A protein has these predicted regions:
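Short, positively charged
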Residues: 1-226
């Protein structure tokens, strides 16, 4: 009989934790800011905040003044389509997770997802204890681990069909076979965090007016193993 050749995807953490979903201008999310009519002076003051945690501090100031973040769109149409292919609500879910990661005191993806799940911005029916948000985030992580990248149209094809190898910093090798997908999903879900990339390089983290004079703010998505 024919024995299929199994392909494995490999991530090495030797020399530092590797990224799972890489930042770029293509991974920016745009929000409109409502709830408060910001003056030019306020906008300038917020944009000039230059602390070591300036993105978080700018967001805190926007919220202090009554500003509300309303997700508008992901900046890159291809990346947004890839997200929608995984789940039609994934862009909005990740947008909520992004805002939360810059508001609370954790960057841990599992903790952030659980927090957003508690707030339930999509009003899912939680009567039966179904984990809507966690399931969708896990699907995103699996897709990212197996070949989905931001600016390349993706059709749900996984680049590895056998499993996923993780080379840990101490040289140990973890092997996840796809026939135990839940174990693999949980590994990704429990071992990833969001990371703030360079705001000047990728053009996010400042208040600005769009072409219709609406006040906007961009946040950037990057996921790294922790």
């Amino acid at each position: 009989g024919m024995t299929p050749t199994l392909g494995f995807s490999i991530k090495s953490q030797i020399g530092g934790n590797s990224t799972l979903f890489n930042a770029g201008k293509t991974t920016n999310f745009t929000f409109t800011i409502t709830g408060h009519n910001f003056t030019d002076t306020e906008i300038e003051a917020i944009n000039s905040i230059d602390t070591s945690s300036k993105i978080r501090d700018r967001i805190r100031k926007i919220k202090e003044l009554g500003g509300v973040f309303c997700f508008k769109a992901m900046d890159d149409a291809i990346c947004q389509n890839n997200f929608i292919l995984i789940d039609s609500w994934l862009p909005l879910i990740m947008a909520n997770i992004l805002v939360e990661s810059n508001r609370g005191d954790t960057k841990d993806l599992k903790a952030l997802t659980e927090h957003v799940s508690t707030e339930n911005p999509l009003n899912y029916d939680t009567t039966y204890n179904q984990h809507f948000y966690a399931h969708k985030v896990k699907n995103f992580l699996v897709a990212t681990a197996l070949g989905m990248v931001p600016h390349t149209p993706w059709n749900g094809t996984y680049q590895a069909n056998g499993g996923y190898l993780v080379v840990k910093a101490d040289g140990d090798v973890l092997c996840y076979h796809f026939y135990d997908r839940n174990l693999f999903e949980d590994y990704l879900y429990c071992n990833t965090k969001l990371e703030t990339a360079s705001s000047s390089r990728y053009g996010f983290g400042k208040l600005y007016k769009d072409e219709t004079n609406r006040l906007c703010f961009k946040l950037n998505l990057q996921v790294r193993f922790k």
